[in-house]
Amino acid sequence: MKHFIKSIITLLIILTAFSLKAGDEFCGIKNTAFVPGELVTMKVYYNTMGLYIAAGEATFSTSAEKFNGKPSYHCIGVGKSYSFFDNFFKVRDRYETYIDTATMLPIKFIRDVNEGGHKIYNNVTFNHGTGTAVSTNGVYKISSCIQDVVSAIYYARNINFDKYKANDKIPFDMFLDDEVNHLYLRYIGKETVKTRYGKFHSIKIKPLLIKGTMFEGGEKMNVWISDDPNHLVLRIESPISVGNIKVDMMDYKNLKYPLTSLINTR
């Protein structure tokens, strides 16, 4: 379960922005999808022998704060392995971002992870005016309207999916591991999905993944999000280097809108 929360956040990045160029519609979107106080819990299941085992969970929370005098959304992703998996690989990860409420662009990104005793800390300050990101490891050029791995989730929840047709390929840029990554997602369409939480009307998409420790490159991941104004991630399925994983939304609090995509609970 190496890179646990990073992997979960990477899974959630499928919600990132839509534009023919990462600079047109990608910029300037206002937040209408979430409010401070929202809390969402995802549960991770791991499968190697045909049986899914609960391996851990990740929570995503938001609050309203000021950062360097700017009104900001403080969004935090926390991941941990369950005690059973701690015996194999203990994970205690924390990712957070401060998002400018006026532009929905990240101001500050912090990564503080402990994975199997291997600790990583990275602190990134974004300067969109000069097109640079100053991280713990150096200064890097960034593209306009770039997102970090947490801000992307909240930014993209404000996108109108109805304007896209099946198989549309939608590019976006993301700053991750001190690099600008040029990615895309493919819009598949709308369908009903059954999760461990319940049955939903959903939107299905496939992200392009970067080949890494856990995930194979390409479009092998499937993601379902709620077909309502909240655009919550409901389910993620993907093969990994050994076996496959499934991630389900299991709890939510303080959504801005009723979860009207929910047909029934289990």
Language-model segment annotations:
Residues 8-17:
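Bacterial N-terminal signal peptides
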Residues 23-126, 164-266:
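Acidic, serine/threonine-rich low-complexity disordered tracts
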Residues 118-160:
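Hydrophobic, well-structured mid-protein blocks that either form specific transmembrane helices
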Residues 1-9:
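Bacterial N-terminal signal peptides that target proteins for export
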Residues 18-22:
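Sec/Tat signal peptide C-region and signal peptidase I cleavage site
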